[in-house]
UniProtKB/Swiss-Prot annotation:
This is Chitin synthase export chaperone. It is found in: Endoplasmic reticulum membrane. GO terms for cellular component: endoplasmic reticulum membrane. PANTHER family: CHITIN SYNTHASE EXPORT CHAPERONE. GO terms for molecular function: unfolded protein binding. Keywords: Cell wall biogenesis/degradation, Endoplasmic reticulum, Membrane, Protein transport, Transmembrane, Transmembrane helix, Transport. It comes from the Eukaryota. Belongs to the CHS7 family. Interacts with chs3. It is a multi-pass membrane protein. The chain crosses the membrane at residues 48-68, 84-104, 122-142, 147-167, 184-204, 219-239, 249-269. Its main location: endoplasmic reticulum. The gene is chs7.
Length: 331
């Protein structure tokens, strides 16, 4: 396999784009690379569902993403709150798109299928770019939550989405000099650039923890996220067909990759949540007993005035009689 070719990748991993790249079949005339093994379909309520196990994990991922978003939104004054929540919104959109594709809501060989796969690729690139820009927020190079910070991350993510979407669509449709057999640009955008973005983010967070934080526990979150992410990629691209054969086509590497990606995203949240401190003076907590009185006021700071006016409707009021000697009379 030459650089930028998907032949060996698609023979092991049943990726959605594999049916849109590669040489044309001499029999059917359609493009696509058939994997050695892929998960069997399941029938539910007279509906055929592709990749049932992976689709189930996508649904779990949606629920977990909603929980993480709610937790981020509850930290009103946390550093990088608006920036990191953009990352989770993009991940939610990517999960929904992947669920639609993997479950067969938009089946392969259908007209809209190339467009959905192009959107999936675009969201994948946007997600990695958003993660990259989030890596700079902790260094306070610019104030977080401002117009510059929020729209910088939104615009860069949108630009990478458009670039990846267009390259994918041009490749699938043989437009602009690209073709399903000329996939170098697609490979660079999906794998090389995304890998560079993730690597830079990891380096930035390591520098942030080592140079600015006394606590080293966040390194555990980073390490666990990296390990599970790498395991998911290895299981997908290295052992997907082996797993599929050994479990009688009930699972394949896509299931494990989806699950490991979810764990990696959760570690991104845990890392951000751990290193983020909130200004409690201006926050609105969702937990009871957020505030705690540590000690009573000193005795000398308490009011010592005794109120004697029992006829007033305000038990706490006091009337002082003026003692004037004007004109020799007391008033």
């Amino acid at each position: 396999m030459g650089f930028g070719q998907f032949d060996s990748i698609c023979q092991k991993a049943a990726l959605p784009l594999c049916s849109l790249v590669g040489p044309s079949s001499p029999i059917s005339g359609s493009t696509g690379i058939i994997p050695n093994c892929y998960a069997r379909n399941i029938e539910l309520a007279n509906t055929i569902i592709f990749e049932g196990a992976a689709s189930f994990v996508h649904i779990i991922a949606l629920g977990m993403t909603v929980i993480m978003i709610l937790h981020v939104r509850s930290k009103f004054t946390a550093v990088g709150r608006k920036e990191i929540i953009t990352f989770f919104y993009i991940y939610m959109a990517l999960t929904i798109c992947s669920l639609v594709i993997d479950a067969g809501v938009v089946p392969p060989r259908s007209g809209p299928f190339p467009y959905f796969v192009a959107v999936q690729n675009g969201l994948s690139s946007a997600l990695c770019t958003c993660l990259l820009i989030n890596g700079f927020v902790g260094f306070q190079l610019y104030e977080d939550g401002t117009f510059l910070s929020v729209w910088l991350i939104r615009l860069t993510s949108a630009v990478m989405f458009v670039v990846s979407f267009l390259i994918s669509l041009l490749t699938f449709k043989s437009w602009g000099g690209m073709s399903p057999t000329n996939t170098i640009a697609l490979f660079v955008v999906l794998y090389i650039l995304n890998a560079i973005s993730i690597a830079i983010y990891l380096v930035m967070q390591l520098l942030l923890v080592m140079n600015t934080l006394e606590d080293r526990w966040p390194l555990g979150h980073i390490a666990f996220g990296v390990i599970v992410f790498i395991c998911g990629q290895v299981l997908l691209y290295g052992f997907s067909d082996t797993i599929c054969d050994n479990v009688q086509h009930y699972l394949d590497g896509l299931f494990f990759a989806t699950f490991c990606n979810l764990l990696a995203v959760m570690m991104v949240y845990k890392f951000w949540d751990y290193i983020t401190k909130e200004d409690l003076e201006f926050s609105v907590g969702i937990k009871p007993n957020t505030w705690e009185v540590k000690e009573l006021l000193p005795e000398e700071d308490r009011r010592t005035t005794v109120y004697q006016d029992s006829h007033s409707e305000y038990a706490g009021s006091m009337y002082h009689h003026r003692a004037s000697t004007y004109g020799g009379h007391n008033y």
